[in-house]
Amino acid sequence: MKSLIYGYGVTGKSFERYLIKKNIDFDIYDINISDYSSNKDFSKYKKIYCSPGIPREEFKSLKKTNKVLTDIDIFFKEDKSIKIGITGTNRKSTTCFHLSQLISQSDSTNLIGNIGNPVLDEINNGKKYSIIELSSFQLDKMSKNFLDYGILLNIAPDHLNYHNSFEKYKVAKEKILQAKHSSHESDPYNLYEWITGKKSKKLELQNLPLRFEFIKKNIVNDSKSTNSNSLFYAIKEANFIFNENNYSLIMCGDPSKELYTKINIKGPREVIVFGDHRDEIQKCLTHKKVQVFRGLKESLIYLKGKENILFSPGYPSGKDYINFEERGAHFNFLVKEVLDD
């Protein structure tokens, strides 16, 4: 009896590699990929391996009649490392990255999940610790929490178009606290001591790109800003560094993720909005001066000669880009092309 991979993105492809290693026969289904979108009789499959991004109602429906597994469920069952799960609306990647640098001083460490390699690619690879960045999608679909350490950094409204309400999003995030040991601590040095029982020497911790990253003395690339909470954090930092009313904010992305919530922008001298969702974003904003452009290049041409720029989109990429990485790279490229000549 065959199994089925449901969703053929990054996680789906890791399921494929995993099942091939296990000599398990399988089919693939993904409604968004024509080669794999033909209708399936899901009841005929022995197991269904589900990617985290599939809609939660589809997942709930599959679970009624099938044995459904996620990559996290499999990793929990098979891997023997000490498992540290980290989640939060913001700064989870940075916290994972910083904690990994501290633990790696003395012990072997996997950095996996949303931040690194898919978890299935690193099962029992000999590392002592596994630091796993977990999204609300993964936590929502996780059958049972077998983490040794679960860390919830913060919660603010996000992914509301998936969870349907902030309360459901919060419930998903808080599942991480069902670990053997749980914490709300965010300082990586305190987390290191809590987990290992040792103090770490102070390091010059490396940061991830596109998180309030200065690409020039007066230009910040914060492309990782995909929600209003991270946007407000960036504005607070910019208000301190550049001073209020002394910088321009550039925004873009899809506001449907936050159900078109109204946001009041205080700090920048002007807000520049561009992209396919520009009209939707403009309707969500309150600011004394909002300038709207079709594309990023036109936005930067307008800003040429102006002092201090904060690129903090505040929304996920939507129709404009594949992801925040592509968005951030495009911003860096156009800054060089438009502003450096």
What are these regions (language model features)?
Residues M1-G85, P209-R211, Q282-L285, F293-E307, ...:
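Short, basic phosphate-binding NTP loop
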Residues Y18, S108-T109, D187-R269:
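Nucleotide phosphate-binding/pyrophosphate-handling subdomain across enzymes
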Residues Y29, S108-N125:
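Conserved substrate/cofactor phosphate-moiety recognition/catalytic segment
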Residues G126-S186, L191, K319-E325:
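Flexible active-site lid/hinge loop adjacent to a nucleotide/diphosphate
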